[in-house]
From Swiss-Prot:
InterPro entries reported for this sequence: Ribosomal_uS11, Ribosomal_uS11_CS, Ribosomal_uS11_sf
Protein name (record): Small ribosomal subunit protein uS11
HAMAP family to which the protein is assigned, alphabetical: Ribosomal_uS11
Gene Ontology cellular component terms for the protein in this record: ribonucleoprotein complex; ribosome
Length: 151
């Protein structure tokens, strides 16, 4: 029988989530707020937009379908996202606000303003606020047919 080999102790690698930073340093993330009239998404990524840090919707916070787009649901979603960001070390956010856009409405839903205010009140520093609603240069045909929506 061959002699037994001694097991080599493996070094444990410490894995940390979130960006590497110094204590007290402001670390930026990007909060993508998509506010339609049916729901509100608050999605925080790193600066490149590739790595998702937290994503919460208004529908995840309330039970009734009619309340998904409400300002209250958006506020709860934004507070939840801010809490997750703080645990991962993100202290400041750039805001990208988006409405449905395209050939539909270009105005953000009711949850947009309350989500932004909730992020600001939860001691997150706000960097730049930008509207990224897709606006067509020449739109496709709207829904409703030749004679339009008849009430």
């Amino acid at each position: 029988m061959a002699p037994r080999k001694n097991k080599v102790a493996k070094e444990e690698v410490q894995v940390t989530l979130g960006p590497q930073h110094l204590v007290g340093e402001t670390v930026f993330g990007v909060a993508h707020i998509f506010a339609s009239f049916n729901d509100t998404f608050v999605h925080v990524t790193d600066l490149s937009g590739r790595e998702t840090i937290a994503r919460v919707t208004g529908g995840m916070k309330v039970k009734a379908d009619r309340d998904e787009a409400s300002p209250y649901a958006a506020m709860l979603a934004a507070q939840d996202v801010a809490e997750k960001c703080k645990t991962l070390g993100i202290t400041a956010l750039h805001i990208k606000l988006r409405a449905t856009g395209g050939n539909k409405t270009k105005t953000p839903g009711p949850g947009a303003q309350s989500a932004l205010r909730a992020l600001a009140r939860s001691s997150m520093k706000i960097g730049r606020i930008e509207d990224v609603t897709p606006v067509p240069s020449d739109s496709t045909r709207r829904k409703g047919g030749r004679r339009g929506r008849r009430l």
